[in-house]
Amino acid sequence: MSLASTQSIAEIRARNKELIQEVLKVYPEKTAKRRAKHLNVHQAGKSDCGVKSNIKSIPGVMTIRGCAYAGSKGVVWGPIKDMVHISHGPVGCGQYSWGSRRNYYVGTTGIDSFVTLQFTFDFREKDIVFGGDKKLVKILDEIQELFPLNNGITIQSECPIGLIGDDIEAVSRAKSKEYGGKTIVPVRCEGFRGVSQSLGHHIANDAVRDWIFDQVEADGKPKVEPTPYDVAIIGDYNIGGDAWSSRILLEEMGLRVIAQWSGDGSLAELEANVEGKLNILHCYRSMNYISRHMEEKFGIPWCEYNFFGPSKIAESLRRIAGYFDDKIKEGAERVIEKYQPLVNAVIAKYRPRLEGKTVMLYVGGLRSRHVIGAYEDLGMEVIGTGYEFGHNDDYQRTAQHYVKDGTLIHDDVNGYEFERFVEKLQPDLVGSGIKEKYVFQKMGGPFRQMHSWDYSGPYHGYDGFAIFARDMDMAINSPVWKKTKAPWKEASRAKLLAAE
């Protein structure tokens, strides 16, 4: 049952504020003061969520964030399928991040596509003392020999590379010239940079600008035959096929997708992007930088879209169509009408089973708000949400378009805080990452992994909404929960038995 149906908004707000104070009591005074700035209760009418964000995590806490290398290699560059991405530094960073994201792609692995392969080398202490450029040259030569159909290479720097000052830019230029002008992109994404993976996104965007788009501009040759309806999908990483289910809708409404990146993206699509008429941006946090650059440099407008759940899909299709003529606007309405029977069937089947169920979210820099509409389409209520690496403009978007009055907001929440919030608010479902998954399942509550869809998906588009609804129902209403109870539900049952 929805909390709002049994408590007034004022009561919910007061309860959540009291909960925040209770959680902060365990900290030393200075730490409590710092963490208090990241925890708040949303108040309707405010322009943002009232929390500080994009600030260094407190040393010693179990933060859930990643590093700049993760943001660049793991998020932005890694899914570009026809380029080889080198983890430049000690073996651990590449090994322990290998295959952690489900970036689907079309191609033959090891021949013309390399997403699920890991390229690194035996970087040792002597390389830190004497420099790693010689080994970098060697691995570049080996890649050229072993994988001759690669269309480009990126060098993703790990922490030691920035500390010892290896000149990866000079190596990149020299080897590019040696290989006949092959695209080789040095990326200064050392993990110590910034406060989270967010700076890695920005660094990766800047590398696209400096080493891809600037070269395309200098070349001056057209990459595609232009049409009035050319668009690019940016910031969809094709987790479980998300970008494909989004692309279907755009093409059905009459648009031509000339570039899709990073998920299932290629170097040729990156180069063609500068000739599009509109950039359609999914993950604002990781790709707004390059979208803004293309608007300033090439005059290409951009707009955000959200294809989670039918309400937001329809809203986004109409927003995108607004940049084009009546043909595309009519196409958008036609697509919405076409899929309405599917939407009706999904809601008729799953909403009665999920109505009033409560959810708490904690994801990266986008989904903590984007998926809220899909839950609401199923009659569910998000009672708490926050970002690992969101910025203030993310919380502004969250406050203005997604969360309700009284929602608990938690930025850069650590393991202790998140567990206490869940214990007290007792949601029917928690949606977060792989590090949190088993903690909450062991606590006896349903959980969905909202970074990679728990090996399901896609969740984007109308087809994805059906899968999303099925997965949420499967998590919450699984028969296994009849065999075990969350501690707070056991306590409630004991109280009822005592009262009888």
Curated annotation (Swiss-Prot):
Its cofactor is [8Fe-7S] cluster; [7Fe-Mo-9S-C-homocitryl] cluster. GO terms for cellular component: molybdenum-iron nitrogenase complex. CDD domains: Nitrogenase_MoFe_alpha (cd01976). Belongs to the NifD/NifK/NifE/NifN family. It is an enzyme of class 1 (oxidoreductase). [8Fe-7S] cluster binds at C67, C93, C159. This molybdenum-iron protein is part of the nitrogenase complex that catalyzes the key enzymatic reactions in nitrogen fixation. This is Nitrogenase molybdenum-iron protein alpha chain. It comes from Rhizobium sp. cowpea (strain IRc78). GO terms for molecular function: ATP binding; iron-sulfur cluster binding; metal ion binding; nitrogenase activity. Binds 1 [8Fe-7S] cluster per heterodimer. SUPFAM superfamilies: Helical backbone' metal receptor (SSF53807). Pfam families: Oxidored_nitro. InterPro entries: Nase/OxRdtase_comp1, Nase_comp1_asu, Nase_comp1_CS, Nase_Mo-Fe_asu. GO terms for biological process: nitrogen fixation.
